[in-house]
From Swiss-Prot:
EC number: 3.2.1.15
Enzymatic class: hydrolase
Binding partners and assembly: Monomer.
Chief location of this protein within or outside the cell: secreted
Protein name per its UniProtKB record: Polygalacturonase
Subcellular location: Secreted
Cross-referenced InterPro entries: GH28_Enzymes, Glyco_hydro_28, Pectin_lyas_fold, Pectin_lyase_fold/virulence
Signal peptide: 1-21
PROSITE patterns hit by this protein: POLYGALACTURONASE (PS00502)
Biological function: Contributes to the wilt disease production on tomato.
Catalytic activity from the UniProt record: (1,4-alpha-D-galacturonosyl)n+m + H2O = (1,4-alpha-D-galacturonosyl)n + (1,4-alpha-D-galacturonosyl)m
Keyword presence, Cell wall biogenesis/degradation: yes
Length: 529
């Protein structure tokens, strides 16, 4: 595993220096995928200089008046609109070192790349009116689930567009909104927290959203502090996200180690003045939905919800590769909960996860329920180093109590060369292995385990929840035979619970994780950890 750290360092150095690609590639189930590259200087159609100087990562002093909420939107959008296909709009520092741009919703077009240069940040407006799609409720929490906010950056039906560079996109989720009923009284993340406290639906903008289209690229950019999901692809064919960093909340809205002062977080006070990953709700990192040929490689994700959520609600999602990534706080590399149109052919390789013993931490997770279930098949996790994760392995078709007739079916799942180093704080940890058996349906979880090793105290099997049975239940285990399975002796076969075991564990050494973990701050200076 450890050869990748040299590659990561080279790639990071190349981006910081503004160099082109280092020539790395990854092997996906559908073929080789090459590292993207920065555009040549000759391919830059327009260079725009920053005019804002952030103060400690904040531009709140600039746009307290909502009339000044997006001073750079028109010139960035005009540059994109007038840029020929195959060229890039480049955002650079100003002549006096200014590094900030401030904009509302922008639209990419086919063949055009937005290049955010080293040290430059594109800040998102905190005026909900700059994102509202016509419903008039962006920046509020509603009983309706109809989405009312456009994303900061939208790529609709584009071919060959993307966002690259060693700069950053900052959604300013911890800043007070400046218009509407919540003006100057709630931050975006306070609004999101109303989902938990009042059961309302947040109407907050995402940062990057693709609709349909093909060949979309994200390369090197840091994406942080989104009011909602960071990156979502919907119905897109060919998505490459390489060397990206998702850091939420960043130091602009937190403190070192996420050690917020008592009473400063949104579960205790409104508006909050300090945020932790546990208190920035619905801030998924990378969500490919209804998409094909998706790569996330050499990337780092720290956030308040799913690191990744692979979804299939209105079309199948298939052919995905997650390679050489580092995950920190978050709710796991997840499939679901929407799986009704099917997820298939996914490989996860060389992944490290350090959950920092968060109360909401998940590792590898497939989740769904009878309202949105479908077939999830041919999923391989190979080469995983994990520590301090509350729920390391979760295969759960009873994710909620919502009823329906779209039944989950998880088949041909493989977990191999998995090594969990335990919990530094000795928190109570659990695992979930469940097939779907209800409503006269019987869809067993079929899963192969090979060299699945836990150091220290084994996580317990999860108890019953949301109408489902205690774990394991409805599971057909196969032991691959190469390496051990630490909890093999705890699996009780039974015709009553439909738990079967085929094969025997092997004796190979556990995966070496001694050099696997990388402090996030070493690659993302805005990180509190």
């Amino acid at each position: 595993m450890n050869h990748r750290y040299t590659l990561l360092a080279l790639a990071a150095a190349a981006l910081s220096a503004g160099a082109h690609a280092t020539g790395t590639s990854v092997t996906a189930p559908w073929g080789e995928v090459a590292e993207p590259s920065l555009p040549a200087d000759s391919a830059v159609c327009k260079t725009l200089s920053a005019s804002i100087t952030p103060i400690k990562g904040s531009v709140d002093s600039v746009d307290g008046n909502p009339a000044n909420s997006q001073p750079d939107a028109s010139r960035i959008q005009s540059a994109i609109d007038n840029c020929p296909a195959g060229q890039a709009v480049k955002l650079v520092k100003g002549s006096a070192g200014e590094s900030g741009f401030l904009s509302g919703s922008l639209k990419l077009k086919s063949g055009v790349t937005l290049w955010i240069d080293t040290g430059v940040t594109l800040f998102a407006s905190r005026n909900p009116a700059d994102y509202d799609n016509g419903l008039g409720t962006c920046g509020t929490a509603t009983t309706s689930n109809d989405k009312s906010c456009n994303a900061l950056i939208v790529a609709r039906d584009t071919a060959g567009s993307g966002i690259v560079g060693a700069g950053a996109i900052d959604g300013r989720g911890g800043s007070l909104v400046t218009s509407g009923p919540n003006a100057n009284r709630l931050t975006w993340w306070d609004i999101a927290y109303l989902n938990k406290t009042k059961g309302l639906n947040q109407q907050n903008p995402r940062l990057i959203q693709t609709y349909n289209g093909s060949a979309f690229t994200l390369y090197g950019v840091t994406v942080q502090n989104s009011p909602n999901f960071h990156i979502v692809t919907t119905g897109t064919s060919g998505v490459t996200a390489w060397g990206i960093k998702i850091v939420t909340p960043s130091l602009a809205y937190a403190v070192a180690g996420y050690k917020c002062p008592s009473g400063s977080t949104p579960d205790k006070v409104t508006p909050a003045t300090c945020f932790t990953p546990e208190t920035v709700k619905n801030t998924d990192g990378f969500d490919p939905g209804q998409s094909t040929n998706v790569v996330l490689a050499y990337s780092y994700i720290n956030t308040g919800d799913d690191h990744v959520a692979v979804k299939a609600s209105s079309g199948p999602t298939r052919n995905l590769l997650f390679a050489h990534n580092h995950f920190y706080y978050g709710h796991g590399l997840s499939i679901g909960s929407e799986t009704n149109t099917g997820v298939s052919n996914m490989l996860v390789t060389d992944l490290t996860m350090d959950g920092n013993d968060s109360s909401a931490g998940n590792g590898l997770r497939i989740k769904s329920d009878a309202s949105r279930g479908g077939k999830v098949t041919n999923i391989v996790y190979d080469g995983i180093c994990m520590r301090n994760v509350k729920e390391p392995l979760v295969f759960d078709p009873f994710y909620s109590s919502v009823k329906g007739s779209l039944y989950p079916n998880f088949t041909n799942i493989v977990v191999k060369n998995f090594h969990d180093l335990g919990s530094a704080k000795s928190i109570k940890r659990t695992m979930t292995f469940l097939g779907y058996k209800a409503n006269k349906q019987k869809n067993p979880l079929t899963i192969t385990l090979d060299n699945v090793v836990f150091d220290g105290t084994l996580p317990a099997f999860e108890g019953s929840h949301y109408g489902g049975p205690a774990s394991p239940n409805g599971v057909h285990f196969t032991f691959g035979g190469t390496g051990p399975v630490s909890f093999a002796d705890a699996i009780v076969t039974s015709s009553t619970t439909d738990v079967t075991v085929t094969g025997t564990p092997g004796t190979a050494a556990a995966v070496d994780c001694s050099k696997a973990f990388v402090p996030l701050k070493s690659v993302a200076p805005t990180s509190p950890i």
